[in-house]
Regions:
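Charged/polar positions within long, soluble alpha-helices
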Residues: 18-21, 46-54, 75, 79
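Charged low-complexity stretches with an acidic bias
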Residues: 56-81
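Amphipathic, hydrophobic secondary-structure cores in small proteins
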Residues: 27-35, 39, 45-60, 64
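Charged, amphipathic alpha-helical oligomerization/scaffolding segments
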Residues: 8-11, 15, 40, 65, ...
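N-terminal acidic leader/helix
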Residues: 2-32
Length: 81
C-alpha cells in the first residue's frame, strides 16, 4: 500500500475515533481499530471468533474490557451532546 493511502486511511480512522469517542490519539485509534475488526469478524465468521476466544481466554477478557471501555466512552460522549 502506498504511503499516501496509509495517511489517508489514518485520517479516516482518526476522524471515526473522534466521532465515536469524543477524542482521538494513537492509543484510542488502536483500540477502535481492534474493536472494529473484532466486531466485523464476530459478525462474518463467528466460529473463528469462538475458536479464538476458547484458545486465548486471557485475550478474550482483554477484548471484553476493550469493548466495555469503548461503549462507555461512546455513551459519555453522546450524553454530553
Amino acid at each position: 500500500m502506498s504511503e499516501k493511502f496509509n495517511e489517508q486511511f489514518d485520517g479516516l480512522l482518526e476522524k471515526y475515533t473522534e466521532l465515536l469517542l469524543g477524542e482521538s490519539n494513537e492509543e484510542r485509534k488502536e483500540q477502535v481499530q481492534k474493536w472494529a475488526l473484532y466486531s466485523y469478524i464476530a459478525k462474518t465468521m463467528p466460529a473463528s471468533v469462538k475458536h479464538w476466544n476458547e484458545t486465548y481466554p486471557d485475550a478474550k477478557e482483554e477484548m471484553v474490557q476493550l469493548i466495555t471501555d469503548i461503549k462507555r466512552l461512546n455513551e459519555e460522549k453522546r450524553n454530553e451532546q
